[in-house]
Amino acid sequence: MKRREFVKDLLLAGGSLAIAPRLDLTAAIPPPPTDIKRVLVTFMCHLDVGFTNTQAAVIAKYFDEYYPAAMKVATTMRQSGEDRYVWSTASWLLYGYLEHLTGAARNRAEQAVVKGDLAWLAVPFNLETEMLDRSMLEGAIGISQALDRRFDRMTTGAKMSDVPGHTRGVVAPFAANGVKLLDIGVNGASTVPEVPPVFVWKEPKGNSLIMMYHHGYGSVIQVPGSDLAIAVEVRNDNAGPHSLSEVAKIYADLRKQFPNAKVSAANFSEVALAVEPFKDNFPVVTEEIGDTWIYGVASDPVKVARYREVMRLRKEWVEKGIFNVGDSTDIRLLQHLLLAPEHTWGVDTKRLKDYEHYTPKALATVVNAPRFRWAESSWAEKRKDIDDAVQSLPETLRSEAEARLRALRPVVPDRAGLRAHAAGSEIETSHFTMAIDPQTGAIHRLRAKATGREWASPHHPLGLFAYQTLSQKDYADYRAAYIIAKTWWAPMDFGKPDIEKFGAKSQVWLPRVAGCWAGKLHDGFRTLIELEITDVEAERADRVAWPRRVYLDLRFPDSEPAVRIALTCLDKAANRLPEAMWLSFVPAAPEPRGWTLDKADQPISPFDVVKGGNRHMHAVTNGVFYKDAQGSFSIETLDAPAVALGERSPIYYSNDQPDLTKGLHFSLFNNAWGTNYIQWFGDDMRFRFVLRA
């Protein structure tokens, strides 16, 4: 995320980046007419629900200062001439602002909406959309639709910024709910997906969106085959509305750039209406794009697991008709729950101003210092959003949600009814012949009795736990592959400065079996493996913080050919050095193109991703699926959505296709991101998976 004080080598907010894109993507678009006659200009600022301050402080800033300032600028412009100022904001933010106001203040804001001075986007704010299922995406648009009903509008334009890419799974739910156009502004340092500036994004069932892509938060785009240009003017992160002088300069610059054009202010729905007649001139993209920032979501496993549990429960309630998408109960819930996949996870970590206290012991000496407490409070604030979502529910639903969340708490697994078992010896269950690797505890034999197919072997482990640390070279390689702007802030946001001084190494540790127990249950079979990692040198050097106790709990129900996995990790110390934890699956699946990913409830091939998108890590909704002529295999993940394909690293970036023969690696936790993601984590964790074969 760029900040005005950081972006010294970028153009002013609203302009394109002061760098050339890696690839000229305009060749496939018909050249625009030289005589542009209409310019629509949109005004907004980039919303981070956090980052520049805590979430509560940022919201207060918009409510107390920015909305009144925007209305004042709009009123002054209206009174002084023909030019207008229309401030477009997130639907979630404007909805909350109107609910916050009372009396004359609310009336003034409502009149500003009626006059068109304040406008909202179809999306609630900037989302990491791979974290939402389809029902949640529809609910997110429901906030805009609630405002539409209130003010007799039809919002069809959406914009998101910062996050470089999104999943194709958004196309169908957005289109089904009236969204016509989605404008994307890419973070200043991040690789831009190799898509045209204007295109139609089409999904397999024929639904489509008009897309506009900027190398920066906004820029001026000439619409192919038309006399129309769109200027997207975006002030920097939480910087508020434009000043009168800024607005005057924007109008003057656009009139100089397009001397024969009428320049007028617009909201994004008016942009969608103006652009749509030229849709047939635009190239069509059918591939997935993906989110190259998605590795950050694994920085808080507790928040993510609790969010996903409530998301699933919400979907169950909607499917049962207990409430409807976008109704009052849903809106109250989503006002809080949607903040979990919002792209801001805390305050700006650069404001710690500390590149000395990285190791577990060193971190412990400063974690109670004011700046460190401030950072931790911002992460806790984000977790509380889920509690607030649950508290917004009617009593019976609230009780159900609270019970589901309590069930997530990690505990030492009960060994009642189990006996000591020699790891490595075969176990017969109703549906499988199974064996555990006596060294690592992973499944190294899984024969499906119904088909005779062997899905696991010593070279094809299933459920292999691993702990990883990263080096400065790992980050240098990552930035060389991914960062496209030489800014002084990028190495801090996309790296860990000076970690080489504290012994940071690129290394992976596998566990060893410390105990194994097995036994028949009334409804199936259960195997419990206790794992441990030991490395005296690494521990003495104070550069690792793996969990002291790890349990892999395998249950084989009689009712279906499935393996229910629960991985419990206890007693992990907080560590600011970059680290990651994984659960890997390398099934005997010889046809790489047999894999599909479930993203926002849409199947997507891992080989159908644009260059510059994310080809090596995805967040999945339900899981991953494999099918060939001989059978099928699936991995359902309940708590850990981010999965790396082939390469087991949170910061591997490449335009090469993934090598799925190397397996699929679920990111249980990593603190590889800087920016505003969680930088250290010392909580207990529990992760659930279901294998079906």
Where are the language model's segments positioned?
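Intrinsically disordered, low-complexity regions enriched in Ser/Pro/Gly/Gln/His and often acidic
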Residues: I19, E194, T286, V310, ...
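Catalytic-domain carbohydrate-binding cleft regions of carbohydrate-active enzymes
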Residues: L12-G14, I29-I386, L521-A693
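N-terminal export signals
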Residues: E5-T26
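Catalytic and substrate-binding regions of extracellular carbohydrate-active enzymes
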Residues: D327, I331, L339-C569, D683-M685
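Residue-level detector of intrinsically disordered, flexible termini
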Residues: L17-I19, T26-A27, H421, F465, ...
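Ubiquitous "structural anchor" signal
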Residues: R22-L23, D152, H460, T621
